């Protein structure tokens, strides 16, 4: 049995793509997932399963129960912990002036592909580093609107390929 993390993209934002996390938890348990827990209302799920490929099962549950076609990023908990263990020294500094994110790629694109599509980060305003299939991204809160990556990650054609979590959220998920 493996422990997994499922990250749902774009749910419960401004009343759109509404999914009750307790209902989703119950549906997952009824489908054979074990030790299911959710964190926040933004689509962070931790569970144990014997299934090798849980992603289509989760997507189908969401489609059938909530009538929503929501992309799911699935990662083994051990892989997530490895990613966090290899975070750049500048990421998750604890500074309230910085916003530290981890970008997960939903599409078949590699992290390098996404980075190339978005382009270089804004000098002195943001930092980006790729590790395996994710991108660490940090920017100053006071200048976020000037950041190249801030603008590009929300554009059509790119936003759909990503799901983004803050450093704090990812750390909390990894402790479950």
Show which residues each predicted segment covers:
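Surface-exposed, charge/polar-rich loops and edge strands
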Residues: 2-42, 46-176
């Amino acid at each position: 049995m493996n422990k997994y993390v499922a990250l749902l993209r774009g749910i419960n934002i401004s009343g759109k793509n509404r999914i009750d996390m307790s209902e989703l938890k119950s549906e997952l348990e009824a489908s054979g997932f074990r030790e299911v827990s959710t964190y926040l209302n933004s689509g962070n799920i931790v569970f144990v399963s014997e299934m090798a490929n849980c992603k289509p099962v989760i997507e189908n549950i969401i489609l059938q129960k909530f009538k929503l076609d929501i992309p799911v990023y699935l990662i083994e908990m051990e892989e997530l912990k490895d990613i966090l263990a290899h975070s750049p020294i500048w990421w998750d500094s604890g500074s309230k002036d910085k916003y530290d994110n981890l970008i997960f790629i939903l599409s078949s694109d590699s992290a390098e592909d996404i980075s190339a599509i978005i382009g270089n980060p804004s000098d002195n305003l943001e930092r980006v580093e790729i590790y395996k299939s994710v991108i660490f991204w940090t920017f100053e809160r006071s200048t976020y609107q000037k950041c190249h990556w801030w603008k590009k990650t929300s554009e059509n054609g790119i936003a759909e390929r990503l799901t983004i979590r803050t450093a704090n959220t990812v750390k909390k998920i990894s402790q479950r």
